[in-house]
Structures are given as C-alpha cells and as structure tokens.
Design a protein with these regions (language model features):
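Catalytic machinery of carbohydrate-active enzymes
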Residues: 1-194
Length: 194
C-alpha cells in the first residue's frame, strides 16, 4: 500500500498477504505508519528540510519502497482514450479543492491566451465533473499547459508535450518525460510549501 490515507491503510491491512510494503494503519492512534523501508517516505512528507534534501522523483522513491530500482519508467494509465488530437494547446487551469494554492492566477491564463492570439487553437480545461471526459480532453491536446495537478500526471501517462507551472510544490519530485517545468524566479524559503 503506497497511500498514507488511514482508510486505505486499514483496507489494505485487511488483505491477507505474506509481505507488505508501504504503509499500514495504527488502530490505536488512527494514523498511517510505515512498514520496513518506508519510513524515509513519511519523513519526506512530514519534514520540509528532509523533503528539500531528497533529490529524487516520486517514481524512484516508490520503486525503492517495494525493493525495486526505477529506470525511468513512466506511468501506466489503465484507460485508453478514443479522442484524436484536436487542439494545439490545452489550458489545464483548475487544480481542484485540495491544494488551491497550486493554481496559477486566472488573469495570467487570460494574458497567456492573448499572447498566443490566433496562432494556435486553444482549449480550456474540460471534463471537470467527469474523469473519462477529462482523459479524453487531455488526449485531444497536442501541447498541455498545466499547474501541478492530477492533469499533469495524466498528461505524462498519455505522453503529452507538457509545459508545467510550479509554485508551492517541489518541481524536482515530479518526473516529466516530455516537457519543461517553469518555476518561480525567486527562490522562496517556504518551497516546498505543501
């Protein structure tokens, strides 16, 4: 189990297995605890200074948790989109409710749209209420401009060309096989802020 959510940990603990990796549920305290080899992942998540010192992508960290070596493998998406590329550029502006501070301000998105003008076709984020529609929309974009969000990870799995906008999260943790990362020009002491 590679998820720290207590309910997911409790569910995975109920599965009969001879070897476990990742996290387990502590019923006495109601929190996630680490199995052997996973303690450093909790430290990355809980301690900002440790997080800054860790210079690995999450893929590499997760592979290590299960005793394997990451060799640049990308994500596998269990969904096969049916859409064709329709738009030159997709603007993935919404980050969801969990981390609103990851969002690039809307006025910047509008300014970027004006700068691009009519040179390329632009599509604004679609499928906000339906994950299948969201996959299809991402697949319909040739280049994907996105905040650090679920859409970024889906676009990576779909092998899209990506321009990723980072703010409060640590860009070095995210593996983007085909794209670039844009970071704040100033090095803020708080980054990573999440």
């Amino acid at each position: 189990n590679l998820e720290k959510v207590p309910g997911v940990c409790a569910f995975s603990d109920s599965i009969n297995a001879w070897r476990r990796y990742g996290f387990r549920f502590d019923p006495e305290n109601g929190v996630a605890l680490a199995y052997d080899g996973s303690q450093h992942v909790l430290e990355i998540c809980m301690y900002q200074e440790y997080k800054k010192k860790t210079k690995k992508h999450w893929e590499e960290i997760l592979f290590e948790m299960v005793g394997a070596k990451w060799q640049g493998e990308g994500c596998i998406l269990g969904y096969k989109p049916q859409s064709n590329v329709t738009y030159d550029i997709g603007f993935n502006y919404d980050v969801g409710k969990k981390w609103p501070n990851k969002s690039w301000p809307m006025e910047y998105w509008k300014e970027l749209e004006k700068l691009i003008g009519n040179k390329y076709t632009i599509s604004w984020q679609q499928g906000l209420k339906n994950i299948d529609e969201y996959f299809e929309w991402i697949n319909s974009c040739h280049v994907f401009v996105t905040n650090d969000s679920l859409g970024l990870h889906i676009a990576c799995a779909l092998n899209k060309k990506i321009l990723a906008l980072f703010g409060p999260t640590l860009a070095s943790e995210i593996y983007i096989p085909s794209g670039i990362k844009l970071l704040p020009q100033t090095q803020y002491n708080c980054i990573p802020c999440l």
